[in-house]
Amino acid sequence: MTTANSEEKTYPIFTVRWLSVHALGIPTIFFLGAITAMQFIQR
């Protein structure tokens, strides 16, 4: 955090980490909501 020279040159935000977080986070929340809704609809 003190010296961010190498990190500023490359963009660590738009990398595999960003893709994995969004590719695994959004669908997980969506599926969790769908499963919860189905549980309430069944009974």
From Swiss-Prot:
<keyword id="KW-1133">Transmembrane helix</keyword>
<dbReference type="GO" id="GO:0009055">
    <property type="term" value="F:electron transfer activity"/>
</dbReference>
<comment type="function">
    <text>This b-type cytochrome is tightly associated with the reaction center of photosystem II (PSII). PSII is a light-driven water:plastoquinone oxidoreductase that uses light energy to abstract electrons from H(2)O, generating O(2) and a proton gradient subsequently used for ATP formation. It consists of a core antenna complex that captures photons, and an electron transfer chain that converts photonic excitation into a charge separation.</text>
</comment>
<keyword id="KW-0408">Iron</keyword>
<dbReference type="GO" id="GO:0009539">
    <property type="term" value="C:photosystem II reaction center"/>
</dbReference>
<dbReference type="GO" id="GO:0005506">
    <property type="term" value="F:iron ion binding"/>
</dbReference>
<dbReference type="GO" id="GO:0020037">
    <property type="term" value="F:heme binding"/>
</dbReference>
<keyword id="KW-0604">Photosystem II</keyword>
<dbReference type="InterPro" id="IPR006241">
    <property type="entry name" value="PSII_cyt_b559_bsu"/>
</dbReference>
<keyword id="KW-0249">Electron transport</keyword>
<keyword id="KW-0793">Thylakoid</keyword>
<keyword id="KW-0150">Chloroplast</keyword>
<keyword id="KW-0934">Plastid</keyword>
<keyword id="KW-0602">Photosynthesis</keyword>
<keyword id="KW-0472">Membrane</keyword>
<keyword id="KW-0813">Transport</keyword>
<comment type="subunit">
    <text>Heterodimer of an alpha subunit and a beta subunit. PSII is composed of 1 copy each of membrane proteins PsbA, PsbB, PsbC, PsbD, PsbE, PsbF, PsbH, PsbI, PsbJ, PsbK, PsbL, PsbM, PsbT, PsbX, PsbY, PsbZ, Psb30/Ycf12, at least 3 peripheral proteins of the oxygen-evolving complex and a large number of cofactors. It forms dimeric complexes.</text>
</comment>
<protein>
    <recommendedName>
        <fullName>Cytochrome b559 subunit beta</fullName>
    </recommendedName>
</protein>
<dbReference type="InterPro" id="IPR006216">
    <property type="entry name" value="PSII_cyt_b559_CS"/>
</dbReference>
<keyword id="KW-0479">Metal-binding</keyword>
<keyword id="KW-0812">Transmembrane</keyword>
<feature type="binding site" description="axial binding residue">
    <location>
        <position position="22"/>
    </location>
    <ligand>
        <name>heme</name>
    </ligand>
</feature>
<dbReference type="Pfam" id="PF00283">
    <property type="entry name" value="Cytochrom_B559"/>
</dbReference>
<dbReference type="InterPro" id="IPR013081">
    <property type="entry name" value="PSII_cyt_b559_N"/>
</dbReference>
<feature type="transmembrane region" description="Helical">
    <location>
        <begin position="18"/>
        <end position="34"/>
    </location>
</feature>
<dbReference type="GO" id="GO:0009535">
    <property type="term" value="C:chloroplast thylakoid membrane"/>
</dbReference>
<dbReference type="GO" id="GO:0009767">
    <property type="term" value="P:photosynthetic electron transport chain"/>
</dbReference>
<keyword id="KW-0349">Heme</keyword>
<comment type="similarity">
    <text>Belongs to the PsbE/PsbF family.</text>
</comment>
